[in-house]
Amino acid sequence: MIKQRTLKRIVQATGVGLHTGKKVTLTMRPAPANTGVIYRRTDLNPPVDFPADAKSVRDTMLCTCLVNEDDVRISTVEHLNAALAGLGIDNIVIEVDAPEIPIMDGSAAPFVFLLLDAGIEELRTAKKFIRIKETVRVEDGDKWAEMRPYNGFKLDFTIDFNHPAIDASTQRYKLDFSAESFMSQISRARTFGFMRDIEYLQSKGLCLGGSFDCAIVVDDYRVLNDDGLRFEDEFVRHKMLDAIGDLFMCGYNIIGEFTAFKSGHALNNKLLQAVLAKESAWEFVTFEDEAKMPVAFKAPSTVFA
């Protein structure tokens, strides 16, 4: 039987909030089977929980935010959510003493490191997957995103940036998903932004934690970071990282093929909600026989070592 996963122990780290620029303490705790992914703000009294849920995603301008019925929000969850998807973690409580998850280095890699450091525990309950049965597509102008049936998890993402630092040959990336491919090819790709946009936002009291330490920063001509890019096509790889985190907002790994052109947080979430709203397009599945599970979701030896 393919089992649900959680952490073996509590793990904690500190970082800086992208929006506030203030120190954030992040604590990740093991959780029982069928808990799901719970984000919790402990800076509020009483603490407020935000279960990962596609319908709770309401603000996607600069990041992915979860917003509850009282309009209380928690921001910048997408990179940590991508790390959870990458390692197939089903049950976890994530606490922060701030209104946002720390940005760390702008990628998912620090979260992957923390989760592996905590260790991953298999529970005695079957892991549920969402299997795509019908093609679902959403559009917004010339942007689009699509999910179709596939026995695994495959992603094909294309961006369209007219910028000297982003060569035309590096604007499309394809991935046959697995924990190994996510960790090696996707998790280290950082978020990116224009220096002029960061300066403007900071003048308005926003993006106060934005810096060269947590993003690829470009001007009109080049990448400004001293250490350059981690991958030649780091920009599109990061957009794929965002999509993996956005699609895992349902709390389940998806068995299907995701294809997108110029998609972002809002369109990724629109696709996820469109899939879930069409009952004939998907089904829950479990695997009693490991041999029948798509290889995409087999845990690498490093996860349970």
UniProtKB/Swiss-Prot annotation:
Instruction: Name what cofactor the protein needs.
Output: Zn(2+)
Q: What is the E.C. number?
A: 3.5.1.108
SUPFAM superfamilies documented for this protein: Ribosomal protein S5 domain 2-like
Matches recorded under Pfam families:
LpxC
Q: Which residues form the active site?
A: 265 (proton donor)
Instruction: State the Gene Ontology BP annotations.
Output: lipid A biosynthetic process
Query: Which pathway does this polypeptide act in?
Result: Glycolipid biosynthesis; lipid IV(A) biosynthesis; lipid IV(A) from (3R)-3-hydroxytetradecanoyl-[acyl-carrier-protein] and UDP-N-acetyl-alpha-D-glucosamine: step 2/6
Sample GO molecular function, one term: metal ion binding
Catalyzed reaction equations: a UDP-3-O-[(3R)-3-hydroxyacyl]-N-acetyl-alpha-D-glucosamine + H2O = a UDP-3-O-[(3R)-3-hydroxyacyl]-alpha-D-glucosamine + acetate
Q: Which UniProt keywords apply?
A: Hydrolase, Lipid A biosynthesis, Lipid biosynthesis, Lipid metabolism, Metal-binding, Zinc
Which domain of life does the UniProt lineage start with?
A: Bacteria
Q: Which GO terms describe its cellular component?
A: membrane
Top-rank EC class of the record's enzyme = hydrolase
InterPro entries in UniProt: Ribosomal_Su5_D2-typ_SF, UDP-acyl_GlcNac_deAcase, UDP-acyl_GlcNac_deAcase_C, UDP-acyl_N-AcGlcN_deAcase_N
Residues binding Zn(2+): 79, 238, 242
Per its database record, what is this protein's job? Catalyzes the hydrolysis of UDP-3-O-myristoyl-N-acetylglucosamine to form UDP-3-O-myristoylglucosamine and acetate, the committed step in lipid A biosynthesis.
Listed PANTHER family: UDP-3-O-ACYL-N-ACETYLGLUCOSAMINE DEACETYLASE 1, MITOCHONDRIAL-RELATED
Record's family? Answer: Belongs to the LpxC family.
Question: What name appears for this protein in its UniProt entry?
Answer: UDP-3-O-acyl-N-acetylglucosamine deacetylase
Source species, please?
Proteus mirabilis (strain HI4320)
| UniProt gene name | lpxC
